[in-house]
Structure formats: structure tokens, C-alpha cells
Amino acid sequence: MRPGSGAAIGFAREVSEDITALVLGENLDAINAESAKFAPVLAADHPALAAPVADRWAHVIAEVARAQNAELIVATSTTWAKDIVGRAAGLLGGAMASDVIGHEMVDGELRLRRPMFAGAVNATIVLEGSPQIITVRPSAYDAPESADTPFAIEPIAIDADALPNATQFESLDRKTGARPDVTEARIVVSGGRAFKNSEDFEQHVGGLADALGAATGSSRALVDAGITPNSLQVGQTGKIVAPELYLALGISGAVQHLAGMKNSRVIAAINQDPDAPIFEFADYGLVGDVYEEVPRLIAELNGGQ
């Protein structure tokens, strides 16, 4: 199970004891068994759902929600998931909130906290009507404790002829490499303008990330310079992340970058400029040259080697 799915289940469990996990795709035995450790499972297992076609998955989610009289639909805040449940919200006529990072129940009313205006503020909102559709930041909630006895797994019938066909699946290029996705990782190591080329970025940012089992991220400056791919960009025009630990290496702290990571639980920064804006947001800061400090950190983490 991906960490983001665990976060969605964790949020749902905090809100209600009566939850069900809907699993979609093909050949789902392994993920069904994993999901059943946390909640009863409805398994939508069909070849027509094997490909990541959002309108088909949204159709199934909406049909199941109607059949189950669901009051709340929860998913993780990935680009893919928001595309799917956003469509489902439209089909169901429900209200939706994305990127939720916290909540509270007040007199039976669910109040949600989410960043707005590029992360400048955290707003508390209340959704009206039913069902309510919510996506939560992957690192905002922990997966609940697994049950001693697995919950039941119930297959659901899929009418392939009733699925939308407006979008046809062609191909999928899967990401290669052992590092986790930057939007779901519990630790993110990001590099900024201080790194002069892609080799230096990989040696320092990638090296520290590998020592920590972390994902790598990048500032917009490195993407614009062609040093890192767009898929690594963290910020207002890139990925929005909120890991348990965010390490900013040679990143000054431009507003557009802060918008993408300021809700991280712990922020640590290394920058040779003591007046860099990133230090105003960092929980821990080290004034120094990343070319000197990062190799020392990597060596310590690797047992002094």
C-alpha cells in the first residue's frame, strides 16, 4: 500500500469507525489483502479498470458511493487521485476539498484545514451537502494500526459496457529508480541554485536522499537551467509536498518554492547566506557551503565511510 493510501485511511478512521476501502484495478489480490488489514474491502477487479483512465474509475466510484449511500469519500492528494475524485464529485453533485492537512469535529460538524493562496494561509472550511469528497496530503495523517484479524473482502460486479469510453488508454511510462515519489515521501531532500550541474545535484542531493531513504526535489531555478527534470520541481508551479522532514540544500526560499513545502512538519536548511529567507521558515538551519556540509552528512549517515 502506498503511504498516501494509508493517510487516506487514517483520516477516514479518525472521522468515523464505519469505513470501507474501495480498491480499483486488475489483479488486486495483494493490495486487497493489505487493505483488509485496516477496513472492509470492496474490490472492483476488472480488466477494463487496469489502465489509469480517470473517467472510468470516477464512474465506478460514483456508482459504488450511490449504492453504499456514502457520506464521505476520501483519497490521497496526488494529481492522479484529484483528477479521479474530482470527476466523481461532479457525477455525484458533491462538494470537494483537496489537500487537507488537518481537521476537527465541532458539534458534529467536520471542519477541514487546507492551505490556500499558494500556501500563504491555512483556511478552515466546512463542506455543505452529501457526499463530501476530500483528498488529504499524504504525510498529514498516519495509517491506523492494522487489525489482528483481517476484514472481509467483497468483490463487486463491473459492467464494462457501461463504463465511459471518451478516453482511450494508449501507454504508460513508469518511473524507474528506487526513490519514492516526492509527493508521498516522508522525507524529501531538495536542491537549489547552489548546485552547478546535474552531476553535482545527483552526488549531493541524490546521495543524501539515498542515505535517508528519501525522495529528491528541486527548486524552479534548477529546472529552468535544465539541471533537473520538471518532475522534481517543488513549489507553486510544481509539486506540493508536506513530508515529515524537508531538507532544503542551497535553496534561498523564494515565495513560489515556499508555497510548495512550507507545511512540512520539520524543515531543515543549509545555505551559505545567513540572511536567506528559508531560515525564517526552517526549524533547523546550518549556515555553510552545501559542497562541504552535505558530504559530511552523507558520510555520517553511511557510518563514517
For each predicted feature, which ranges?
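N-terminal glycine-rich FAD/FM-binding segment characteristic of electron-transfer flavoproteins
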Residues: 1-305
